[in-house]
């Protein structure tokens, strides 16, 4: 975690100096993507066992 933060700080500063709106937009996009991915993953995991059971019963 510490290593990542150190390597990330310079990149963030550069993106900010280039264009604040652009960095903000990319950040929001990445956040929404990670959220949707985690949600879909949890749903698929909980769904897969149920589907298997239903298929066996049918």
From Swiss-Prot:
The keyword Transmembrane does not apply. Residues 1-58 are annotated as: Disordered. The keyword Phosphoprotein applies. It is found in: Virion. Keywords: DNA-binding, Late protein, Phosphoprotein, Repeat, Viral nucleoprotein, Virion. One of its GO terms (cellular component) is viral nucleocapsid. One of its GO terms (molecular function) is DNA binding. Thought to be responsible for DNA condensation during packaging of the nucleocapsids. This is DNA-binding protein. It comes from Cryptophlebia leucotreta granulosis virus.
